[in-house]
């Protein structure tokens, strides 16, 4: 997916405020990647995608995790604020067919 396609997908899932936050993260990730010699486009993509599931209801996040075969640890199960990162990574793999593990891993963290 291109950055623009990812951006449109993210926009569908987030509030305007959180979408703006993701745009800012993408810009800062690209700046840091440029400075430290990392892949600028991958950093930008990971930045825009990092919170794609943040505004998704917890029940739907949990369904995405279960449907993806992800088993949460006890600590993860008790802390719903952790779910969006793992659900986001699963969503990228499943719904968006993102296969770049560096991007998926960055979203999962």
Q: Each predicted region: which residue ranges?
A:
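Generic N-terminal amphipathic, Lys/Arg-enriched alpha-helix
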Residues: 1-15
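Divalent metal-dependent catalytic cores for phosphoryl transfer on phosphate-bearing substrates
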Residues: 8-12, 35-109
């Amino acid at each position: 997916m291109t950055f623009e396609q990812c951006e449109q997908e993210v926009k569908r899932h987030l509030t305007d405020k959180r979408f703006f936050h993701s745009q800012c993260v993408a810009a800062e990730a690209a700046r840091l990647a440029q400075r430290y010699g990392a892949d600028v486009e991958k950093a930008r993509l990971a930045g825009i995608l990092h919170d794609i599931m943040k505004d998704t209801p917890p029940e739907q996040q949990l369904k995405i995790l279960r449907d993806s075969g992800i088993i949460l640890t006890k600590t993860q199960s008790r802390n719903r604020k952790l779910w969006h990162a793992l659900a986001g990574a699963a969503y990228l793999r499943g719904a968006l067919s993102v296969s770049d593990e560096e991007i998926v891993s960055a979203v999962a963290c």
